[in-house]
Amino acid sequence: MSELTTIARPYAKAAFEFAVEHKAVDQWLGMLGFAAQVAENETIHNLVNGSVAAEELASIFVGICGEQLDEHGQNLIRVMAENGRLGVLPAVVAEFVAFKAELDKEVQADVISAIELTDQQKANIQASLEQRLARKVKLNCSMDASLMAGVLIKAGDLVIDGTVRGKLDRMADALQS
């Protein structure tokens, strides 16, 4: 997956910088999202990975996307087709979203708990993370009974393991060393 990210990042960065410069970040996000859905279509996926000439592939792709892509979006598709990179469009979108989140000072936080969290607990976790990270935090909450009790929080590079399972694992490691 990191190879896809490495390939996708320059395209996403170029598109994002262009979008910011032209105050069209949301429009570009929509265009790229639509193009990524087209790229994930099985028939198109087979064309992208087949032996179709880049120019012809770009024309087919742009034709399918129609008015969903403006002139600049079409140019990006053509460049990616010429370089044989249309298959990484979903990764380009993921990178673009990450750049947008950084611009908007937002971060996604995965909160995994042993039991269902109440709305108040979610609000407390969100407020604490926003204060600690100095960013707007969006929570993705899920449950995992194997944690026994407590909460595991992952936000970017930050991992907070307040679970009983995590504490037991750390104690076992300490006893073995």
Swiss-Prot record:
SUPFAM superfamilies: N-terminal domain of the delta subunit of the F1F0-ATP synthase (SSF47928). It is a peripheral membrane protein. Keywords: ATP synthesis, Cell inner membrane, Cell membrane, CF(1), Hydrogen ion transport, Ion transport, Membrane, Transport. It is found in: Cell inner membrane. One of its GO terms (molecular function) is proton-transporting ATP synthase activity, rotational mechanism. PROSITE patterns: ATPASE_DELTA. GO terms for cellular component: plasma membrane; proton-transporting ATP synthase complex. It comes from the Bacteria. F(1)F(0) ATP synthase produces ATP from ADP in the presence of a proton or sodium gradient. F-type ATPases consist of two structural domains, F(1) containing the extramembraneous catalytic core and F(0) containing the membrane proton channel, linked together by a central stalk and a peripheral stalk. During catalysis, ATP synthesis in the catalytic domain of F(1) is coupled via a rotary mechanism of the central stalk subunits to proton translocation. This protein is part of the stalk that links CF(0) to CF(1). It either transmits conformational changes from CF(0) to CF(1) or is implicated in proton conduction. This is ATP synthase subunit delta. It comes from Aeromonas hydrophila subsp. hydrophila (strain ATCC 7966 / DSM 30187 / BCRC 13018 / CCUG 14551 / JCM 1027 / KCTC 2358 / NCIMB 9240 / NCTC 8049).
